[in-house]
A protein has these predicted regions:
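S-adenosylmethionine
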Residues: 1-170
């Protein structure tokens, strides 16, 4: 490549431009472009490339949210509250799983989407729940927490190796 001339690539259309610029498959880009238009698709593709927050779920069977926030803040972690009661974002998560609070099971590292699955299901005490694709166990333990460790949860996963993870996290 010449230092004097910048490399220019001409793409066929907006779908190709967006797909290349945001590093998404063409079929994915085309689907949203055709259904929702260029501006929505740009926003969606850009959002897909953003780094998600580091989220933890408070284990309310062992500690309340405010106490965990206080403990983690005093330990030097910057905590951002979310609109969801027992989900917190940790802005500087390095070393958080080495804390006594993690060791004692006061929180579980879990993506907000997974937290919301259990939250929206909203099982009551003594419920019976079938958790498919349960590994590594975050949703399973959250369901148990929401059920106050009562009821029955059947946790399944197609991978035998992943079943071990569920047991370790229980």
């Amino acid at each position: 490549i010449s230092k004097e001339k910048a490399l220019q690539v001409t793409l066929k259309n907006s779908i190709d431009n967006l797909s290349t610029y945001y590093s998404h498959p063409r079929f994915y880009t085309e689907y949203f472009y055709d259904k929702y238009g260029e501006e929505f698709t740009k926003k969606l593709l850009k959002a897909n490339n953003e780094k998600p927050p580091f989220t933890i779920r408070v284990n309310t069977l062992k500690i309340n949210r405010d106490e965990l926030i206080k403990n983690l803040t005093e330990s030097g972690f910057d905590i951002e509250e979310t609109t969801y009661v027992n989900a917190l974002n940790v802005l500087n998560p390095n070393g958080i799983i080495d804390t006594e609070f993690f060791e004692k099971g006061h929180f579980y590292v879990q993506d907000l989407g997974s937290i919301l699955v259990s939250t929206f299901l909203n099982p009551s005490k003594d419920s019976k729940v079938l958790d498919l694709c349960a590994a590594p166990g975050g949703k399973t333990t959250h369901l148990s927490e929401l059920m106050d460790n009562t009821g029955e949860i059947i946790a399944c996963d197609k991978s035998k190796g992943k079943i071990k993870l569920i047991k370790e996290n229980a």
